[in-house]
Amino acid sequence: MFDKLKVTGLLLNCFERRNDTDIRSMVNDNADVPTKYVLAILWYKVSERQGKILDYMKLSLDADLLPKTHAAGGEADIVYEYEATEHYPSHTLLIEATLADSANQRRMEMEPVSRHLGQHLIRTRNMDSYCVFATNFLNINVISDFRSRKTTPYYDSQDYTQYVEGMKIIPLETSELKRIIQVSKTYKELYPIFEEAFNSVLPPHMWYDNCIKNSI
């Protein structure tokens, strides 16, 4: 539906500027969740159009396949399933997206992102699964929190015997999403970048620029 120029030159630029009206006009005048919808389309292209994208979106669509409602509160925005290949193991990628500003981002996103991934890992026991958090602006303390999750246990609040030792959360700003589309990066190229970034020991204030921005 969206070509490369529209995704990078129009939609992603609107995300950066928080121009919600223009985003809705390009997707659907009645669409409440265009951010998640466009990100799903973008990631489908990155994944070389593999998989059941309509299932992965976790959106209710209208007759024109445009979004009406977003994921339920207990579920990630996009849940992408990958079968094992020579490039990566079988895993699930949870994708969370927000246009929250710098003041609200930490409060709004840190808890639900960690909760969605933690619950998924406890339920599936596939520790190769992880989360990408996409946003127009990254608060340094959000980066710090997500990096700390690498070694922080997450417990099932109803059963303390059920927990995971840590989790992998990769934050991405809109500028990097634009770069991914502009240079036609594919998921099999991004996966090792994310894995190396996850295993890095750099402190949070150095980590994003060195491990994500400069690698994409």
Can you annotate each of these PLM segments?
Residues 3-216:
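Catalytic core segments in nucleotide and nucleic-acid processing enzymes
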